[in-house]
């Protein structure tokens, strides 16, 4: 089985998508269409922008969406996935890649989502940290000793299956 699994916010990097823009007429057309839809040159920020600009939610989310969808489109003839999935923002990329949602509507949805999240972040300044490799109880204990509102969340479980066991569960 082959799958596209699309990332959420946090996968951005300066220069993302430039290789696609340079090598594919279809990708270039989508970047230019995105610039028009968004009302700003997202491609310039993605290709040449400062990390601080790219980290803003209102920029990051459309950038990751664009990169994901354009990359999937460019690979389309060579790699046909059996399924698509995404994490958070990546769910919208998956909808577009699977043709359940068209590119323009997907981008408009992501843009609206990103602006709303940016507004919420500005109204309620906060931060998030990923803690890896520590026991959940220890993380909760540390959180109790920090002033202000601190919440341990996003508990992820570790799973390990042999290939046969994973196939049995999935198929």
Name each model-derived stretch:
Residues 1-2, 127:
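Residues that mark the start of a beta-strand
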Residues 2-85, 163:
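Helix-rich "cap/lid" substructures immediately adjacent to catalytic or cofactor-binding pockets
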Residues 9-11, 38, 98-160, 164:
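Alpha/beta catalytic cores of group-transfer enzymes, especially the acyltransferase/condensing modules
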Residues 32-33, 66-70, 91-92, 104, ...:
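A broad detector of short, well-ordered amphipathic alpha-helices
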Residues 86, 90:
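Gly/Ala-rich beta-loop-alpha elbow adjacent to hydrolase catalytic centers
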Residues 165-171:
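A short, hydrophobic C-terminal helix/tail in secreted or cell-surface proteins
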């Amino acid at each position: 089985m082959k799958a596209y699994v699309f990332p959420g916010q946090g996968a951005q990097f300066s220069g993302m998508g430039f290789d696609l823009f340079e090598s594919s007429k279809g990708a270039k057309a989508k970047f230019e269409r995105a610039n028009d839809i968004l009302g700003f040159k997202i491609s310039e920020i993605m290709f040449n922008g400062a990390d601080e600009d790219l980290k803003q939610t209102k920029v990051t989310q459309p950038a990751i969406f664009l990169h994901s969808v354009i990359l999937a489109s460019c690979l389309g003839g060579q790699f046909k996935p059996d399924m698509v999935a995404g994490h958070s923002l990546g769910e919208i990329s998956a909808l577009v890649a699977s043709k359940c949602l068209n590119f323009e509507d997907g981008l408009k949805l992501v843009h609206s989502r990103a602006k709303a999240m940016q507004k919420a972040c500005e109204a309620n300044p906060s931060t998030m940290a990923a803690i890896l490799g520590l026991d959940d109880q220890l993380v909760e204990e540390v959180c109790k000793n920090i002033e202000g509102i601190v919440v341990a969340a996003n508990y992820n479980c570790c799973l390990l299956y042999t290939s046969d066991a994973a196939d049995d569960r999935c198929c």
